[in-house]
Design a protein with these regions (language model features):
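SDR active-site strand-loop-helix element
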Residues: 7, 50-54, 95-101, 152-154
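NAD(P)H-binding glycine-rich loop region in Rossmannoid oxidoreductase-like domains
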Residues: 37-90, 104-106
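N-terminal Rossmann NAD(P)H-binding glycine-rich loop of SDR-like oxidoreductase domains
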Residues: 3-24
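Active-site Tyr-X1-5-Lys
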Residues: 123-150
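Conserved Rossmann-fold NAD(P)-dependent oxidoreductase catalytic core, especially the SDR/UDP-sugar
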Residues: 81-127, 150
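NAD(P)-dependent short-chain dehydrogenase/reductase
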Residues: 142-151, 155-185
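Short-chain dehydrogenase/reductase
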Residues: 73-77, 114, 124-133, 156-159, ...
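Rossmann-fold cofactor-recognition segment
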Residues: 30-38
Length: 185
């Protein structure tokens, strides 16, 4: 039985992934909360992979203090790298990092198309995206034959009970008839 450890035990992605993994009895899923420093005292050994979804998101990137920015770098970058170093030292084989599409910068203007491929260069437009880029760089330096690093860059994460921008968009979609002649089902 392979053991997987999810960091960010109470996060939307972490709890959703944990529920999804219940379909696979050959995997044992453990979770750990990263809010306090107690995770540093927990053993990662015996886990095949760590899915690192702990992090900060949903900031108003246009109006934050330097203190808030520092906290984002401490959590999204420094803690991710520290967690990966601990995992590698304790024999974990794979570290899966939840990054963000924010590493690519702003979306295309309305009416324009922007296609992102594996060759698209990162170009973060704000501190949140940059905190993820810096984490990715530090994590990839740890990758070797025995310790694989996987970077996931999802677009907006949404679903029942999700936070962030999705509930706002959902509310607008219900109240503003943007496409009144189209029945969206």
């Amino acid at each position: 039985m392979k053991r997987v450890l999810i960091t960010g035990a109470n996060s939307y992605v972490g709890t959703s992934f944990e529920r999804w993994m219940q379909r696979y009895p050959d995997y044992q899923v453990d979770t750990i909360d990263m809010v306090d420093g107690e995770w540093r005292n927990k053993s990662f050994s015996g886990h095949y992979a760590i899915f690192h979804v702990a992090g900060l998101a949903h900031a108003d990137v246009t109006n934050v203090s330097e203190e808030v920015k520092k906290k984002y770098y401490a959590v999204n970058c420094d803690m991710a790298i520290e967690t990966a170093k601990k995992a590698k030292a304790e024999g974990v084989c794979q570290f899966i990092f939840m990054s963000s599409m924010s590493v690519y910068g702003e979306s295309a203007p309305v009416g324009k198309q922007r296609i992102i491929t594996a060759q698209t260069a990162v170009s973060p437009a704000n501190f949140y995206g940059d905190s993820k880029v810096q984490a990715e760089k530090g994590l990839l330096e740890l990758s070797d034959e025995n310790f694989k690093v996987v970077i996931l860059r999802p677009p907006m994460v949404y679903g029942k009970g999700s936070k962030g921008n999705f509930p706002i968009l959902e509310k607008f979609a219900r109240t503003l008839p943007i496409f009144p002649a189209i029945k969206n089902e």
